[in-house]
Amino acid sequence: MFRFLFWCALVVGIVIGVLRATAIRWWRVPSDDPYLTASVSPSIRPGDLILLWRLTKPAFGDLVLCPEPKRPERIVIGRLVGEGRDEMEVNGGEIVVNGRRQNIESSCPIKTFSEHDPETHIEVEQRCNIEDINGGHFRGEIPPSSVRPSDVKTTVPEGDVWLVSDNRLYPYDSRDFGPVPRETCKELIFFRLVGAGGFFDTKTRNQYIP
């Protein structure tokens, strides 16, 4: 019996090791970068332990983790919404790709959430909606009383991708650092193992991230 358990544990360990080396890695969302953490809410939050998939090329609508183009030591996270030669428009919270506007499906189950302004550190309440991209994902809306980010209209260069933050009030995305070389965006965020509250926080444990 002991030998059987030993071999089972060994096989499981080898499988996990192979996956860890080739297909999957885990990463914890930092809590010391207010611009990054504000830009990714409400999809992921500071302290989340998330899984990254590395074997398939990220597609339209995927949430990806990439090095910032001009500062590769810095990590950026965004929704892949444009590729080479796509005509991009970002108007406040709205995204238009090649003339097609990405629509809102419904409100999120959480309805509203709070996020800290990365500059003033004041807590701001935002509405959460589900955006119809890649099956639907959470999107933080811009309150009517807030100053909305700058609009942009551009063509994505060949070989690059365009990233947009899920939090439309506090974005840190391609409007700030420009298009990102596709070859550097190889990791897709797809699962949350645990949240900042740890294993016993069942509300944030073992969740698929669209």
Where are the predicted features?
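Soluble "head" domains of membrane/secretory-pathway proteins
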Residues: F2-C8, G13, G17, A23-P210
